[in-house]
Amino acid sequence: MARVFLIVLDSLGIGAMPDAGQFGDEGTNTLRSATGGSDAHYPNLKEMGLFNIDGVDFSKGTREPSAAYARMTEKSRGKDTTIGHWEIAGVISEKPLPVYPHGFPESVLQEFKRRTGRGVLCNKPYSGTEVIKAYGDEHVKTGKLIVYTSADSVFQIAAHEEVVPLEELYEDCRIARKILTGEHGVGRVIARPFVGSNGQYTRTTNRHDFSLEPPRDTMLDVLKLAGKDVIGVGKIHDIFAGRGLTDFVYTKGNADGIDKTLSYLDQNFEGLCFINLVDFDMLYGHRNDIEGYAKALTAFDEALPEIMHKMREDDLLMITADHGCDPGYTCSTDHSREYTPLVMYGKNLSPGNLGTRKTFADIGATVLHALSVEGNIAGESVL
């Protein structure tokens, strides 16, 4: 009964790609910034080979890694969550999704206001924590929705949970998702609920993503069609618009995501458990919080022995990322165009350096290979 546990450490890039300058990300390195250029607090990741990966030049790594490891190259034209996860799952995007550096067109907003019955505030790129400081009071007074974007292909809606109930906010997001198609088909519509009063507001964990559907079948669809279990943990369900999953569960942050992963390790299933740990990106990368990022990575490292102990003889653990978000890159709080790591551990898997791969899609191809399923997706198995 083969099982694959694929964990995405959301935003853990390991160094700028050659074309990073085209994205404004030259010199970024999330792993180096988050660790302070030291592997001292990550003994389990070090032992597995994270710091032996091509291009990770600030650590000597370990002499005898316990896992197989590789540097992954993003072939798609993008650096966001949707594009990154799609490519991991075997879909390469030749064109970037639309972005709105000057805000959304009036035609989109008018239709959104008509269908939701609410006005709109902001409509420009903004930091998620700053936008509720700037517009929170006016939103509470008027009930108008705070609509904003970023350097990524996102339409974000912030609303106070006591002004706009969560289910209404989620319905407003579904309305926006239906409007934002074709030329305005953004990667994600994101619900950003918050609480607080009088200019002192904080975002809650009740975020939801409403993603564009993948343009073709991913490894999830292939596995489901083959009769395998396909389990999504965290925002995996939202990223893939629910497609290809047989079961899913949301999480309230990294600790909850790790707990749910441990729970699935104890369960009998045959197929894939696909986990996204979002705190690295949402709480620390975007906020330039180096210390927070480092602590979160340490917490994950400390959880690895229990994860590995619970693995069965034919289980495969894969650890990767979907893009970068360098907390030390003060020119921006946006995602960064970086290589990502792949660390693979199995009791029957030979450790060693798998070099630099041409696409994230090799991960999806490897998952299919490990589960003895054939499918028409991009990428080549590393096994």
Task: List each language-model region with its residue ranges.
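Feature captures the catalytic ectodomains and active-site-proximal regions of enzymes
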Residues: M1-L383
